[in-house]
Amino acid sequence: MSYDISFQVRVHGTDLYVPAWFSARCTHAPPRTLWCTCFLKHILTHNFEVCVTAFGFHYLLCLERSERNGHKKMIISASRRTDIPTYYSEWLFNRLKEEYVLVRNPMNIHQIGQISLSPDVVDGIVFWTKNPLPMLHRLSELDKYNYYFQFTLNAYDRDVEPNIPSKNNVIIPAFQQLSKAIGKDRVIWRYDPIFFNERYTMEYHCKYFRVLASKLGEYTEKCTVSFLDLYRNTARNTQPLKIQQETKEQQLEIMQRFSQIAKEYGFYIDTCAEAIDLEKFSIAHAHCIDKERFERLGKCKLAVEKDPNQRPECGCIASTDIGTYNTCRNGCLYCYANYSHNTAIRNTQIHNPTSPLLFGEVGPDDIIKERKVKSCKEC
């Protein structure tokens, strides 16, 4: 039996995670992913830590045992890596119709996984988006699936989110329309990430969070929030914003005020991958890919565990992401999934909605391996 490895990487206090096979290559790019060159010849029988020094940085790699040849749990994430509903909805519906998708391994671009999208094995889909309008007229095509949306709607202007349509005229009505179509229990509002600078102050956030809450409160059950993590690429891309690192006191104040606003408008708040304890404000830790929500919506228990490849504070269950980094055209300065906006534009130019890959085509050097998958339903 062989195993795959989850590398937990801490760089100057920042947690980064990447799933990898036995061999990995260590170059200091891209920022949210660490590529390693250490070749591990033995089979892991337990978890252990190793230290690696490369390019002047010290890495702590926590290696966890997990079965490589086991069946993958079939919760689909669409996608933490890009905005599929906004830019790739036609491609998505083609993939659902053909009941499979191809996804390149971000650690080895010539290694491609073939993933079944059959309703018989897919136990749930989480859609991540800032604008679901391209999907709204085709929601009936999702009827065979258990799904919900993570819908990010912030109070930032175009200096931060340059390619998001008008919040008042487009995005808020889209949120309301989506909720009316599928139910407010399937539409999670995300106000995420929060950061402060000279323009986006405590008072600014609280003022406009209230405005948004007044328009969205009856269309959702909860709002998930988080504070900005300054990874290397986000620190670089947000330099023009002159972000001021928030203090714990500021975190506590804004969460207390947000919690009160949420109560006034009939929803609750939780936090995404934040270590801070906010229980005194009735704010819990979120499970953005949520076993309990899928069980409630699908009326069936699921045998699926917490995702070991996410940060310790993350409460998400294990899932398979069908997106690709550097393919989102939203252009949000705080985004961790686009290392280069120009690269994202180039990649989208070779998108083919009929291709099984999100962008590009299968080449002669590519190796396609079918993932072993099975439903994790217990009903």
Model-based region annotation:
Residues 76-255:
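Conserved AdoMet/S-adenosylmethionine-binding subsite of the radical SAM
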Residues 338-341, 345-379:
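Short Fe-S-cluster ligation motifs
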Residues 220-325:
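Catalytic cores of enzyme domains
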Residues 321-339:
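Local cysteine-cluster metal-coordination motifs and their immediate loop/turn environment
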Residues 4, 15, 42, 46-47, ...:
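Intrinsic-disorder-associated, low-complexity terminal segments enriched in Asp/Asn/His/Tyr and depleted
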Residues 61-77, 85, 115-119, 282-325, ...:
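N-terminal [4Fe-4S]-dependent radical SAM core
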Residues 26, 36-38, 51, 62:
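Cysteine-centered motifs
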